[in-house]
């Protein structure tokens, strides 16, 4: 009787569900381990083979930790708000709730068929009002703390679609859907003040066990730089332009200023004769994405405003230009151009015949900008100074003139938090007719997303919620004042910022989570997910966590202690899997043909967990063959337990068994599952060669296999005569003294020629080695009739006899 995966997998999945095998108790006194997966967006396409890779890794660790006596929290949920469901609703007129519900059912079925040990009683869904009640509650805390504010922000407005698009939905200035023109236009938006936490987000990275590459991505995104704020007065205007620069020492080389086309001063300072050209340029640049505008390969463009600024240290007039390579979202949206020492400024100055003044010696500015170090020249009081000294001196001079100060700048922008969408958490704010605004009282949360059979763009740039009068219009019962609810909704990031906290106490209707439980479970011990979330999701979650820490809601400064990014599973030809290429592998098909255990084993055996590796049907077949070999070793054709498994130890497998326990334990700790599986294969090969298999070794092997292939693990454990699930059985231990052979083979040489090979106990003394060598029949023949001049014994290696 062969290994019937369909029967066995169904049997144990039912057993786990019926017995709630993986239900996590809040035993606050027990040592804990919190293993977290990045929860999925439940798309219409269902699970693909990339999902189970990370999920299998956390599941192996969770099962391993349970066997080590840990209280393990291993939950799963759904990041279910988001654009695809909204798009489906717009295209079909159907409510996204039903679409989302069906997708979740599919995902859940697929995940359960893979045998993951989740505690389904802790399942969360970001679209559940009992969940987003607390997302809204967190928003109110941010608002009360002054961290949520309304600002005019340029957005991607598509008149034809009557809606605002995300950057991802705009390709080359037109909408991805339909190819309609898209314009940048300012709109009132909710923004979160993440910049207030920039330094802490940067500094606390050092305390985390994260891949260095991810930490660097976050550091670069935050982009802390030290420099100066310089203020340039505008000629004949009661206004000035603030610039942030990391090189205030080059101020003597400034020959013009450049503003972003959206800068608030552009319209005010532009002269009459330049107005038309400036307006046209502003309109043209509104059709470009930030990426296009900052593309270094593209030809620089710009327009002179007709206005001039004054250099605060030289008193010279500097023409003010606008150019789209300067973004309003970075720094102050204004640049002091030093073309002699900046490549972009050099290119711009060369194109528009603007002066190029050298202020740092060492280059040839007739040919190109010099960006190296050198002595300052043509720089007044800075002449002769090196870079560092000159920067300090320049700031000193600016401060003395009241024209600047030392400043730290961040590339990080405040987080644009509102979306002009229906399918998201309603923002709990009311705008009153007297111009004030208030948050919805906490006791009235959740503010429910209204159900509607007509989800269509408002046409005004507001979300479709603006069409629903009974939602929008409110009256204050106490004062009779009229108000309008906020119609923007939260971004998909909101629900995923804090979901790991709700798993800790998912049914608490009085608070986000019980403080004692938070204290027990935080921080997350292991977080596994794709590298595509390296910056935004992790940064936003860390930001919210720090705010909640400051409010006394959570007890730790950081949410995720250890982070690991699994690699990507590619198609057979090393290409990314995609529907268009027709190379997507559906896990349902594999579970049906090979079994869930085979899929889990194969994805862990493909290579290192963080590597990008191509899918291979041969590799999949090989993994199945290994499980078949294991089955045949343990189970006879008639289904009975193999009589090779015995209660007496003949010591033949001592060494390989103990080596296997040691190797698998170490590899599970370091997430090197591929090499752990290799060692399990070595053990099985030796078992096939052995006369008998000591039953405790057979059981130990099954315990090590079970976290990777849990269904066959449970079945073999059961067939070995055990009554309980293998889930909470103690993890095997190894005996150091058995990691090496108890006997060694030594050679015996007579006059340099090998005459015998002996197996002797490892701890045999030199004297005993000599005696054993001299007793050997071959040795006796070789030294017969000769005088023994010398005997040299090297423990565990050889005995050399010199005889004449």
Swiss-Prot record:
State its location(s). Answer: Cytoplasm
GO terms under cellular component: cytosol
A GO molecular-function descriptor? ATP binding
Motif 'HIGH' region boundaries:
40-51
A Pfam family hit: Anticodon_1
EC numbers, comma separated = 6.1.1.4
Q: What does it catalyze? A: tRNA(Leu) + L-leucine + ATP = L-leucyl-tRNA(Leu) + AMP + diphosphate
Q: Which InterPro entries does the record associate with it?
A: aa-tRNA-synth_I_CS, aa-tRNA-synth_Ia, Leu-tRNA-ligase, Leu_tRNA-synth_edit, M/V/L/I-tRNA-synth_anticd-bd, Methionyl/Leucyl_tRNA_Synth, Rossmann-like_a/b/a_fold, tRNAsynth_Ia_anticodon-bd
Residue sites binding ATP per the record: 579
Q: Where, by residue number, is the motif 'KMSKS' region?
A: 576-580
The domain of life is Bacteria
Ordered alphabetically, the record's keywords are: Aminoacyl-tRNA synthetase, ATP-binding, Cytoplasm, Ligase, Nucleotide-binding, Protein biosynthesis
Instruction: Tell me the GO BP annotations in alphabetical order.
Output: leucyl-tRNA aminoacylation
HAMAP family under this entry?
Leu_tRNA_synth_B
Q: Which family does it belong to?
A: Belongs to the class-I aminoacyl-tRNA synthetase family.
Q: Which PANTHER family match?
A: LEUCINE--TRNA LIGASE, MITOCHONDRIAL (PTHR43740:SF2), LEUCYL-TRNA SYNTHETASE (PTHR43740)
What protein am I looking at? Answer: Leucine--tRNA ligase
Lineage summary: Bacteria, Bacillati, Bacillota, Bacilli, Bacillales
